[in-house]
C-alpha cells in the first residue's frame, strides 16, 4: 500500500515559488505585495487600480477571498458581489512547536484530529517530522541531537474566542493540551504562532447554487471569472481545478469576442 499523504519537499510554499518562476520565465509580469483597490469596465477592457497606479486588461480572474472579490465587483457586477459576499469564513491559528527528539514519547501515525465534544481547544495536530521525510532530514541537519516538530491548529467556526489569546498564551495552551492528549513534554525548545484570519470558507446548504448564480450573472461583466477555495472547495487540487476552469472561461470569452469583432 502506498503512502496516504503526498507533499512537496520544502513545504507547500515551494509550489507558489516554482509557479511564479515558471510564469516569469514565460514572460509574465508578477506584482507581489500589491493590493488591488479598484476594478471597473472602460471601453471593453478592465481597468485595475492598485494605489496610485492603473493597468488595463482584456480579462481578469478574481482569485481573492470572497469578501475582497465582492468589494471589487460591487459596481460592475452587483448581483454577483451580493452572492459571494454572503460566503462566510473561519479563522485559524497554527502553533508550531519544536521538542527535543530524545524526550518525545512513541507516536503512531502522522497526527490526529480532535472533535469539539472532547473539550479541548486544539482541533488538529500534525507530527511534522514524522509525517514528512524531508522535514525530518532538515530538522536533523539544523539540530544534530534531534528535534521533533509538532504543529497544532486552533479556531473553529462560530467559536473564535481561543484566537483572542496572545501568541504566548496560545503556545502555552498548545503545550498543555498536547501533553495531556499525547504525552508530549510540557516544555518546548522553540515555538511559532501563525495566524490566518478569515482563511477557511464555510460552505452552507445552497452554496453551489449561489456560486452558480453569481457566475452566471457575470455575463454582464464579460472577461471576469471567479476562482479559488471560496467557490470550488479547499485544498490544492480543488484550487488548481478552479483556476483552470476560470482560465478556460476567460480565454473562451476572448476568442468569441475576437470572432464577433472580425465577423
Short names for language-model regions:
Residues 34-164, 168, 172, 180-181, ...:
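Mid-domain catalytic core of redox enzymes
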Residues 156, 171-219:
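Flavin (FAD/FMN) cofactor-binding core of flavoprotein oxidoreductases
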Residues 239-257:
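Internal hydrophobic alpha-helix adjacent to the cofactor/substrate pocket in enzyme cavities
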Residues 1-51, 55-59:
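Helical element adjacent to the flavin cofactor pocket in flavoenzyme catalytic cores
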Residues 192-195, 251-263:
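Active-site-proximal substrate-binding core of FAD-dependent oxidoreductases
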Residues 30-32, 36, 188-193, 224:
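Generic structural signal for residues in well-ordered beta-strands
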Amino acid at each position: 500500500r502506498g503512502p496516504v499523504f503526498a507533499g512537496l519537499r520544502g513545504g507547500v510554499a515551494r509550489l507558489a515559488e516554482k509557479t511564479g518562476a515558471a510564469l516569469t520565465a514565460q514572460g509574465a509580469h508578477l506584482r507581489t505585495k500589491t493590493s488591488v483597490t479598484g476594478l471597473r469596465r472602460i471601453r471593453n477592457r478592465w481597468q485595475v487600480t492598485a494605489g496610485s497606479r492603473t493597468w488595463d486588461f482584456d480579462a481578469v480572474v478574481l482569485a481573492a477571498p470572497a469578501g475582497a472579490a465582492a468589494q471589487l465587483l460591487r459596481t460592475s457586477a452587483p448581483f454577483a458581489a451580493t452572492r459571494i459576499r454572503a460566503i462566510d469564513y473561519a479563522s485559524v491559528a497554527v502553533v508550531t512547536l519544536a521538542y527535543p527528539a530524545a524526550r518525545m514519547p512513541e507516536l503512531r501515525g502522522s497526527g490526529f484530529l480532535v472533535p469539539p465534544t472532547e473539550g479541548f481547544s486544539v482541533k488538529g495536530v500534525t507530527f511534522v517530522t514524522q509525517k514528512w521525510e524531508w522535514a525530518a532530514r532538515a530538522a536533523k541537519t539544523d539540530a544534530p541531537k534531534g528535534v521533533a516538530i509538532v504543529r497544532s491548529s486552533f479556531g473553529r467556526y462560530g467559536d473564535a474566542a481561543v484566537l483572542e489569546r496572545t501568541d504566548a498564551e496560545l503556545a502555552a495552551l498548545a503545550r498543555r493540551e498536547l501533553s495531556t492528549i499525547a504525552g508530549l513534554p510540557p516544555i518546548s525548545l522553540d515555538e511559532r504562532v501563525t495566524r490566518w484570519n478569515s482563511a477557511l470558507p464555510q460552505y452552507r446548504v445552497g452554496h453551489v447554487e449561489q456560486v452558480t448564480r453569481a457566475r452566471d450573472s457575470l455575463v454582464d461583466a464579460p472577461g471576469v471569472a471567479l476562482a479559488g477555495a471560496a467557490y470550488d472547495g479547499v485544498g490544492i487540487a480543488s484550487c488548481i481545478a478552479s483556476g483552470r476552469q476560470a482560465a478556460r472561461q476567460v480565454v473562451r470569452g476572448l476568442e468569441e469576442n475576437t470572432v464577433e469583432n472580425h465577423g
